[in-house]
Amino acid sequence: MKTSRKRHILVTGIHRSGTTFVGKMLSSAPGTGYVQEPFNPEYGVTGVDIWYPYIRQGHVSESYYAEIVRNIVSGHAVYRKKSADGDHFFKKTGKRLLGSRDYLQYLASTKMPGSRRLIIKDPLASLSSEWMHKKFDMDVIILLRHPAGFIASTQRLGWNYYFLSDIMTQTQLMEEYLHEILAPFNIASMKQWQKGALLWQCIYSILDVYAERNPSIKIVRLEDISLAPEEMFRELHKHLELPFTKKTAHKIQESTGSNNPVNAPGGKVHHLQRNSRQLSNAWKRSINRNMAIEIRKLAGPVGEKYYGKDW
């Protein structure tokens, strides 16, 4: 088995849970390389065609996904060349010729000389994280975000699709984990934000089991990082055996200081410089009391375990 210092690191959790922020901060440590969402079926590596794929030992698709992961960590994976609707002509041409920015960053992270630990930031690999931990000896950090904070974040971006139908097409996943959770609900009649809260319960019910079975898989609440960012990142670096440098400390302070805005500007998806102390409860500005009560119910027992009964 590899020593901990050589293990690649998967930073995962539901989408909009802070995986980009945490992944970027960890990747400031020397000897690391950042990999952006290889399991994203829209702009990640070729071969992944479903959202939130569930893979475990003995799964019918295990060998197929094992080859994909081997290619990712060896630097041989290829990202899709997908242009965004707002890309201008030269940007579209550049992507066709050179590949996306994520692919170029991936190449830099995997092809540079020297032994590098990859920081694989990917919420969409969350349901396969236990398998990746066991089969590929990866360290796994699971980011947990308040269910109402998750809904508020997706609503800010106008993201109204929560991947429940993609999850429900995965027979083994449904049989082993989710049938009991989803059976009582008429999902077709639910509002989109209700589906989002139910997805939150589905994802974290499974990830909670993974962490219970594997003590070295670490669950971290985004809110705890927001309230004490340097302290929490020092703890994460120690757990992962990553050096905590002055550069890392400065980057964390710069990204979480009180002079930064609470919310990202406009519809920006990723904005790393935020007022972290105010961010943890920012959802209360856009989620009314009745909606919060409904989200709490839909988040289920795992929501109560990590965030209590009183919001």
Per-segment meaning from a language model:
Residues K121-D122, K135-R156:
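Conserved phosphate-donor/acceptor-positioning beta-strand/loop module used by diverse small-molecule
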Residues G33-Q36, D137-R145, Y162-L164, T245:
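Short hydrophobic/aromatic-enriched beta-strand-loop microsegments
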